[in-house]
C-alpha cells in the first residue's frame, strides 16, 4: 500500500502553521545558522520547478541544523518592484500594486505547498513602504557620503517602452522585453560611486568560501588595471585629451589615436571635409549597445576626423579617428593606438591601412601582432629595457614632464541607479528652483509612491511620476521656495541589495536592523541561488554592505560567507524551459499527482546541485516509488507500524546503518544531496533483506529522510509514537568503530595479470593469503613451476610461474 500524499501533506502543513513550528527565536544559547535563498520576483507565471531546487537545498540544511542543535534563520520574501509588473499595468490598465499582491499570494501558497521550513513571521516585501523606507534611508546615507551623484550619461533609451534600459536588458540592439529598437542618448541620471569601493570589492573576495569561477567573474567585472594616463595635445588648437594605457612603454609605437564617437571633443575637432562622414557614423553607432560595440569578433569600423594629435614623447603627428569599439564610459573615452603590439589596434590598422611601428623585439609584425615581452627598440631612452623596466621608466618621464601620470583604473563603471519608471522606490531628493537640491529629511521617510491611474511613461524621458503635479511640486514651508521632487525611481536591484538584513529584524520601525541582532546573525552562512545573479546582484549587495559597515550599521565586512549556484532544470528535450517552447513543468501539478515530498526528493536526486539537468517523468516516478518502498517497509496495510520493528539489535544491519548516518550527514553538509539519497536507498534495500529492524535504526533513518521529505518524515515519526514534531529531534550519530571493514577484497595476479579476486579477513597473515590465492588459481598454474609469490597484506598476491 502506498501513502496518501495529499492527506499527509495537508495535515502537516496545517500543523506547522498552527504551531509556528519554524519560528526563529532571537534570544538563545544555541549556535546560529543563517540559510538564505535568493528571494523570487513574483511574476504572473507563478513558481516553476526551477525555484524549488535551490529552496529545497537550503531547507534540507536548515532542517538538519535544527536537529543538530542550531538556532536557524531561514526566511523568505519578495523582490517585487520592477519592469514586468509595470508593463502588465500598461497592457491591462490594472494597478501594478494589485497585480503584485495577487502574484505574491499565489507564490506564497505554492511555496507553502512544498513544505519549506520558513519563518513566515519574517516575510519581507520590497514594495511595502515600511520596507522601502529603509531602502530610501540607505540612499540618503550614500548621498551624505558623496556616493550618490547626478551626471549626464549616454544611456540606452527605448522610445517604445519610454525608459532607459540597462545593457543586460538589450539583445541585438532591441529591448529584451517586446523587441523594440533602442538608441543611445545623453540623459541626467543618478549614479552610485561603486568604483570608490573597487579595491575592497576585489581584495575581500579572497576571504570568501565561494566557487572560484564565481569569484573570477567578479574579478573580471571589476577589472582592475595599473598603467598610466598620457595627455595628447591636438595639433593647431589649445585642446588636449587624455588616454589611459596599461602599456605606456609602447608610446613610441603609437601611430594614430581613437576617440569614442560620443567624446566631447569630436564635434569641435572634426574638419569640414570629414563632418558629413563623422555625423553619419555617430548616428549609426547610436543604435548599438556597449556589449555589441566591444565584441572581439566583430569587424572594426571607424572614420577619420581630419584632426591630428601630437605624441608627447617624440612630437609626431597622429591622425585622430573615431570608432565604436572605444566607449565614452570606459577609461577616458580615448585610446592611443599601437598596432604593432595590441590586438585590437592591429585589426583596426589592418582594415584602414594605417602604419605600424615596432617598439618591442620578439615577433614579426609584418605577419602578426606581437604582444609579448622583449627588449625595446626605436624608443630612445627605453631602448634595451624589458617591459616592466620600460613601463616604470616611461611613467617617471611622463610625471617629470607633466605629460602624464601613474594611474589605476577599473573596468567597473559607476552604477547607473535611476530608472524612468513608476513602479520602483521614489528617490528622496528635491530639486529647487534656484538650482540646488536637498535630500528629504529622515523623519519624513518613507517617501511613499503615490497611487495613480495613469502610469504611462511621460515620453520626455522622465518617469510617469512627472505627470502627478500634486506629488511632484513642493514648496519649502520655511522659505516659500518652489521645488520639484526627483521623478526617477530606483532600479529593482535596490531592494534586493539589503533584504538579508531586514529578515534579521523585519518589524523594526526605529532602525534598519537592531545592532545586537545583526551581530548575532551575520554573516549569512549559506546563500543559494541561480548563476544569473553571479555578478551584478552580488556585487551591488557587497557594495552596499561595505558602506553600511563603514557607517557602523553592520559588524562584518562581507554579507555572504558561503555561496552556491544551483544548476538549471531543463525541459525533457534538454532545452531551457519556456512558455514559448511549451515545455514548462508546473510544480502544482506534481504536488497534486506525486506529492511535494516526491518533487523535493526528485530534484535533489537528479544529479549534483550545480549541474544543469533535463527533467524526466520517469525519474519523478522513480522518486515516488522509493518513498512508497520506505512507507511499506515501516507501515503495514492497516496503517500500524511494521512488526519487523523491534527493540532488539541486529548485527547484520549495524554497519549499513552507521555508514548511512556518516555519509548522509557529511553529504548534506557538503550539498551532495544526490549521493546522500543513493546511500539511503542502499540502506532501505538492506533493511528489506533483514529479518528485523532495530527501532533505533528506523528512528535514525526517519530523521535523515525528513529534511528531504518532511511530510512523510513527520507522519512516520508520529507512527513511531511521538507526539512532538520531528523538527527538533536530535540528529542521529554514528560510531566510527562500527564502520571498520572486517573483510577485504584481495586481487590475485599471475605474472602481473589479474586472475581472481578473493574476500578474506583483513587480518589474514601472509601465509594464509598465499595459501588461499594458490588454491583459487590452481587451474591457471597447472603444469607450471611457481618461482616466486609476492604478498602485499590486505591488497594483493602476485604469483610468478612458468
Curated annotation (Swiss-Prot):
Recorded catalytic activity of this chain's protein: tRNA(Leu) + L-leucine + ATP = L-leucyl-tRNA(Leu) + AMP + diphosphate
Binding residues annotated for ATP, in chain numbering: 579
CDD domains: Anticodon_Ia_Leu_BEm (cd07958), LeuRS_core (cd00812)
Gene Ontology terms for molecular function: aminoacyl-tRNA deacylase activity; ATP binding; leucine-tRNA ligase activity
Highest taxon listed in the record's lineage: Bacteria
Subcellular compartments: Cytoplasm
Position of sequence motif 'HIGH' region: 40-51
GO cellular component: cytosol
Enzyme Commission code(s) on record: 6.1.1.4
Entry-linked InterPro entries: aa-tRNA-synth_I_CS (IPR001412), aa-tRNA-synth_Ia (IPR002300), Leu-tRNA-ligase (IPR002302), Leu_tRNA-synth_edit (IPR025709), M/V/L/I-tRNA-synth_anticd-bd (IPR013155), Methionyl/Leucyl_tRNA_Synth (IPR015413), Rossmann-like_a/b/a_fold (IPR014729), tRNAsynth_Ia_anticodon-bd (IPR009080)
Keywords from the named record: Aminoacyl-tRNA synthetase, ATP-binding, Cytoplasm, Ligase, Nucleotide-binding, Protein biosynthesis
One biological process term in Gene Ontology: leucyl-tRNA aminoacylation
Motif ('KMSKS' region): 576-580
Main location: cytoplasm
Family: Belongs to the class-I aminoacyl-tRNA synthetase family.
Name under which the protein is recorded: Leucine--tRNA ligase
Species this chain originates from: Bacillus cereus (strain B4264)
